[in-house]
Amino acid sequence: MNAGYFKRVKELFPNASVVIDRFHLVQLINRALNVTRIKTMNTYRTASPAAAKDYRKLKRYWKLFLKESNDLDYQTYHYYRLFKKVITETEIMDYLLSLNSQLKETYQLYQDLLYCSKKNDYEGFKDLILMTKKHELSPSMETSILTLKKHLPRIKNTFQSTLSNGSLEGSINKIKLIKRIAYGYRNFYNYRDRILLSFSDKKIGNENAMVFAA
């Protein structure tokens, strides 16, 4: 969602409809929630020994914050060392959210936006963005909401389209993996050939190679 990117696309493809990949929408609010959790967590870092326990809980169970609330286990009880008792994931989240009202409101908006994205509900997504009261949210989530407001027309295209750059992202990650496994390539053409071999069964060779016939 880089402004420079959109400007360049408009110059090159003036009639194109821009679709923002859904992954980047989720990533934006995901990071905002995580920043909120960390800031809340740090307020307990230098507090009393009793409050410091909440610091460790907020740090330890960060993955639960990013989980869809419907996926939190509310039936299975496990012993959690920091709580010193058997408890469910839902109960852990209820406790952690009770520590800070701003964190709770930010988390709830995050979950609501995730739900609308999953259900492909653009009107619901838009209403959440436009009707959210800023004073109830963390500064990081407020910034993310302003970004989403700015891109609402493009976000609408996202909900109306099935396009995604997931395949391209997967290819890029595969290429990076090839390079990492080989600890880098000194010869570009060897690197290129290895990539092409991984993505195709076609016979390839070094276009700069010299061929001699007897």
Where on the chain are the PLM-derived regions?
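Short, surface-exposed amphipathic charged segments that create phosphate/polyanion-binding patches used
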Residues: R31-N42
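Acidic/histidine-rich catalytic cores and adjacent linkers
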Residues: N2-F13, S17, F23-Q27, T46-A214
